Regions:
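Active-site core of glycosidic bond-cleaving carbohydrate-active enzymes
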Residues: 81, 96-101, 111-115, 127-135, ...
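Sparse, context-dependent recognition of short Cys/His-centered cofactor- or disulfide-binding micro-motifs
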Residues: 8-9, 38, 72, 92, ...
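Conserved helix-loop functional segments at active or binding sites
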Residues: 26-33, 123-127, 131, 195
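Internal hydrophobic scaffold segments of catalytic domains
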Residues: 1-9, 66-70, 214, 220, ...
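Aromatic- and acidic-residue-enriched carbohydrate-binding clefts of CAZyme catalytic domains
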Residues: 10-62, 77-116, 144-169
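An active-site-proximal structural segment forming one wall of the substrate-binding cleft
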Residues: 1-4, 53-74, 105-137
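Active-site-proximal loop/turn and secondary-structure-junction residues that shape catalytic pockets
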Residues: 8-12, 20, 71-77, 113, ...
């Protein structure tokens, strides 16, 4: 109970200040209306400034609570691809989502600019959060766009992968390798195991009631929450 896992972005909004990518706050932190509960037509959004986040971290540290940030990828990224359409497979402008769900416009795993973006964002996160852990999401990433994306299909060929599930494993492993090079330990949701090639140093957060792959991962020495 002394860990605060802070989910900082999703399809409905980007909630952390970025000095490197200010458009994320100008555009990605705001949606046209609030579709949860009692919908209204008012613009909804906002984000935590870096100073506000530092205040939260200090508040938690004083109470022996460690703050673990999560930047979800490659799915649940509508706030990103609506701000930067060129980071999606189709490059088409889309709005932020206003309801809950699983949405098919995700980061393009065949586009090298996507990795540059992710590394840039994670650099900002690491500068802000002293925690040794970073959560990279990995849940609920539908692959329909990847199946029909020339760049993603070319990446599969170039990296000698077998399918789009392995492409997500490739995506995760590049992010994990980058974070490990910075001295961080990486967490991800249990769907990340579906690729069968995930870095076995990754700590899996199983939110789906002890899935078979998670049990097998644990039995092979993997770390599971």
């Amino acid at each position: 109970f002394n860990i605060f896992h802070w989910h900082l972005c999703d399809d409905q909004g980007w909630r952390i200040e970025s000095e490197k990518y200010p458009l994320l706050n100008e555009k990605g932190s705001w949606r046209d209306c609030h579709g949860f509960g009692s919908p209204n037509m008012e613009r909804y959004g906002g984000y935590f400034t870096k100073d506000e986040i530092r205040d939260v971290i200090k508040f938690c540290e004083d109470r022996f609570i460690e703050v673990v940030p999560e930047i979800d990828m490659p799915g649940h990224t509508t706030a990103i691809v609506s701000t930067f359409p060129e980071l999606s497979c189709r490059g088409v402008q889309i709005p932020l989502e206003t309801t809950g769900g699983i949405f098919k416009n995700i980061l393009c795993a065949g586009n090298e600019a996507v990795f540059d973006f992710c590394f840039g964002i994670l650099d900002e996160v690491m500068e802000l959060f002293p925690c040794k852990y970073i959560h990279i999401g990995g849940d609920e990433a539908p692959k329909a766009r990847w199946c029909n994306c020339e760049k993603c299909q070319q990446r599969i060929k170039d990296e000698h992968l077998n399918n789009v599930e392995e492409l997500q494993g490739y995506f995760a492993n590049r992010i994990i390798a980058y974070l490990k090079s910075k001295g961080k330990e990486v967490l991800a949701w249990n769907e990340s195991l579906n690729s069968g090639i995930l870095d076995d140093d990754c700590i899996i957060c199983d939110w789906m009631d002890r899935t078979h792959k998670s049990e097998a991962y644990a039995n092979e020495g993997g770390r599971i929450i």
